[in-house]
Regions:
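A broadly conserved sequence feature marking short terminus-proximal activation segments
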Residues: 1-44, 149, 156
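Cys/His-coordinated zinc-binding microdomains
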Residues: 53, 67
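Short, conserved beta-turn/loop elements at beta-strand boundaries and strand-helix junctions
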Residues: 85-90, 138
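Short aromatic-glycine-enriched beta-strand elements
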Residues: 91-105, 145-148
Length: 156
């Protein structure tokens, strides 16, 4: 019996097994430009709305508030603030990590949105903690969000 010929849903069959699902996420125009700026210039960029003035990180092509086209890009700086965080003790495969990893949503001053990334050079984190992006050396960058190695705490 093939699935195309089943007319009674109670006749459908199932099977247990493992199915490979390889995929690629395409970044689009704004995402590609954003990562290229990180790779080539070690800059975190935002897109500014010409109508309502909102700056978006990561950048978008259109304002989600007023739908204006976003063509002005600006450097939002390397420093931000921990908005929220979590401490991971297991990896994506469910295996215990040797050392817990801190991940945080980093917000930048005057910006809508932010970046989720690792916190490094500390085992302490708190909401409101000031942090700064640490970029990989230029020769190691690949136009990936991981070109930012991590965010480190900064003194006030």
């Amino acid at each position: 019996m093939s699935l195309e010929k089943i007319t009674n849903p109670l006749s459908a069959r199932h099977w247990l097994g493992h199915m490979e699902a390889d995929y690629r996420y395409t970044l689009g125009v704004a995402g590609e430009r954003f990562l290229k700026e990180i790779k080539e210039n070690a800059r975190i960029m935002g897109a500014k709305c010409p109508k309502c003035g909102v700056v978006f990180v990561p950048p978008r092509l259109y304002c989600e508030k007023c739908f204006a086209k976003l063509e002005e890009w600006m450097d939002v700086g390397k420093r931000g603030e921990v908005y929220t965080y979590t401490i991971a003790t297991i990896d994506v495969d469910g295996k215990r990590l040797e050392k817990p990893q801190i991940y945080a949503l980093i917000k930048f001053e005057g910006v809508h949105g932010g970046l989720i990334h690792r916190i490094g050079e500390t085992d302490k984190v708190y909401i409101g903690m000031k942090v700064e992006a640490v970029f990989k050396p230029p020769a190691e960058r690949k136009a990936s969000i991981n070109d930012i190695a991590y965010f480190k705490p900064v003194e006030h």
